[in-house]
Amino acid sequence: MPSTYAHRRFGADVLVQLPRELREKITPYRPLYDMGLHGPDLMFYYRALQSNPVNRLGNAMHEQPGRVFFTRARGVVNTARNKNAALAYALGFVCHFALDSTCHPYVERYTRESGVSHCEIETEFDNQLMREDGLDPMHFFTAGHIRPNREFAKIIASFYENVTADETYGAMRGMVRVHHLLQATSPVKRWVVLTALKAAGTYDVMHGLVANLQPNPRCEASDKELEALYQQALPLAVRLITEYVEGLSNGAPLDKAYDHTFGEF
C-alpha cells in the first residue's frame, strides 16, 4: 500500500478528473470517499497492537483479486438506503485498488533488491510527496481527513463480511490514534516511539511507518519510480471508476484489471 498521504493525494487528484455529474454525487459524501481511499487498510487499525479477526481481514483482502471486493460492493451500493453515500466509499476504494495494484509489484521487487522494508519505501515516498507539496513530513498530520463517525461506520461496515459498525468505528478511531502515535515530530519523540515499538515486539513490522529525520538515500530510486507509477495509475483510476458506475446499472462484467490483487500479483 502506498502510504496514507499518497492515497489521500491520489484520491484528490483523481476526483478533479472525474465527470462533473459524478463529482457532484461524491462531494456531499467526501468523508466517505476519503475513507474509501485507504481500502482494506482501514481494518488494520482495529486494535492494531493485537491480532484479531478484523485486522487480519485487512491483510487477507490484500491477497484477494480486486473483483472479490468489488463484486460484493456492487450489491451493497445498489441496495443501499443512501446510494450516493455508499457509492462515494466504493469509488474511493477503486482509487486505492488502482494505486496499490500499480505500485505494489515494484515495491515488493525493490524491497527484495534493496533490503529496505516495504513500509519504509512507502513512508519515504509519502514524505517526498509532502515535500513536493510544500508540507513538512515531520509535522503534517496525514490522517487529518479521517473523521470517525458512527453513521459513516454503518455504511462502511456493510461492504465487509462479518464486520460490525462498532468494529468499523473502532478501526476509524484506531487509524487516527496510530497516526498520532507514530508521528515523530522531534528526534526525542522518534526515539520514544521506536523504543516503544521494540518493547511491544512490533518494531520489525511498524518501524518503517515512522518518518526518518532525513530522506533515506536508498529510497531515491524508489521515490522516482513510484512517482512515475503514481502518474500511470491516475488514468487507470478514472477509467475504472467511470466503468464501475456504468456497471452498477448495466451489469457489465468487471474489468480484467480486477484480476490483480491489492498486492504484488
Feature annotation, model-predicted:
Residues 1-90, 98-265:
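N-terminal leader/auxiliary helical segments
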